[in-house]
From Swiss-Prot:
Top-rank taxon, per record: Bacteria
Protein name: Thymidine phosphorylase
InterPro entries reported in the protein's UniProt record: Glycosyl_Trfase_fam3 (IPR000312), Glycosyl_Trfase_fam3_N_dom (IPR017459), Glycosyl_Trfase_fam3_N_dom_sf (IPR036320), Nuc_phospho_transferase (IPR035902), PYNP-like_C_sf (IPR036566), PYNP_C (IPR013102), Pyrmidine_PPas_bac/euk (IPR018090), Pyrmidine_PPase_CS (IPR017872)
Subunit: Homodimer.
Amino acid sequence: MFLAQEIIRKKRDGHALSDEEIRFFINGIRDNTISEGQIAALAMTIFFHDMTMPERVSLTMAMRDSGTVLDWKSLHLNGPIVDKHSTGGVGDVTSLMLGPMVAACGGYIPMISGRGLGHTGGTLDKLESIPGFDIFPDDNRFREIIKDVGVAIIGQTSSLAPADKRFYATRDITATVDSIPLITASILAKKLAEGLDALVMDVKVGSGAFMPTYELSEALAEAIVGVANGAGVRTTALLTDMNQVLASSAGNAVEVREAVQFLTGEYRNPRLFDVTMALCVEMLISGKLAKDDAEARAKLQAVLDNGKAAEVFGRMVAAQKGPTDFVENYAKYLPTAMLTKAVYADTEGFVSEMDTRALGMAVVAMGGGRRQASDTIDYSVGFTDMARLGDQVDGQRPLAVIHAKDENNWQEAAKAVKAAIKLADKAPESTPTVYRRISE
């Protein structure tokens, strides 16, 4: 039996906590026997004193074990359980292609996703722009879809890592969100509760990233890889670029449209293709579905070329109560904005810099995201045909096409787009889409 205040005192004085102490505290968070003040105090001591790798692993596993951990053995699946997690960005629609692509190559992806957070779009919000799409199937249905289709994308239920929800709510109001051991545990508790064999992390870098600097993004990626492997899940991370909108679109329905076009081959943004392929390659290699980069890429290209990946996406949408002919007729089903009109730069030039965070917030301001949990989303608004870094823009080539609910909405968005995109006399040097791969 431990006392919460003694655990806080021990960490306050700079000592490492034992696995038993950490489990006692996390179980107390779940059971409401630990007060909000005690959660806040421990969070602040961790913020200032950090945690050793064994402490980080213990914290993550205790939070994972505070709820249900999915077990797939009874389904006798003939492939690995794999997933991807992104720290979030703008136009980051990779999950919608990656899940079906990896499933078409023999993986099983029980992806538990989130809503939009701040300037970043949420995979669940995007999928809910599809009429009827059910993000909360019951457990039996979820398992059926995984077995039959190979991929399902659902919302977090209250039974998964419940201690994280309470811990995070307290961190959010006590300035202790940006602590690497706490971020790592929060991300991984939910992911590891999926019962994975392998995980790839997409850690964003740049103006639209969660972490403000390259060094902090790198530190987070290294922490996640170390902790997840310590918890027994084969994990790698990619540091990918978020200095510009990743896809050609940003919003909800507009990104789903781009995802379908990507899968069918109608249109593929080259940077989105690079990042999606790189993440899928990691999943295939970690999941032992391919022995190396070349074999993984060949398999992935094949399921894009032969239509299998698009077919899996269509089957997932139908299995989650969306239209059965969605891939063939997406334009019929996705909501469209009242006003669709391009915005042009005031001068000619080359796109040299993009405040990606500001562009994400502009989508939120249009109604495409939430400022508070109770807000409703306008799924139709957003941007398409986004100019990329290095593009020449003028009276013919717009900065973006804005999908707005009315003229006022369009004007506000146009102002935001112009303010977020800087022009120069010559094109900037191109930056990589993937900066670094991190493994154990």
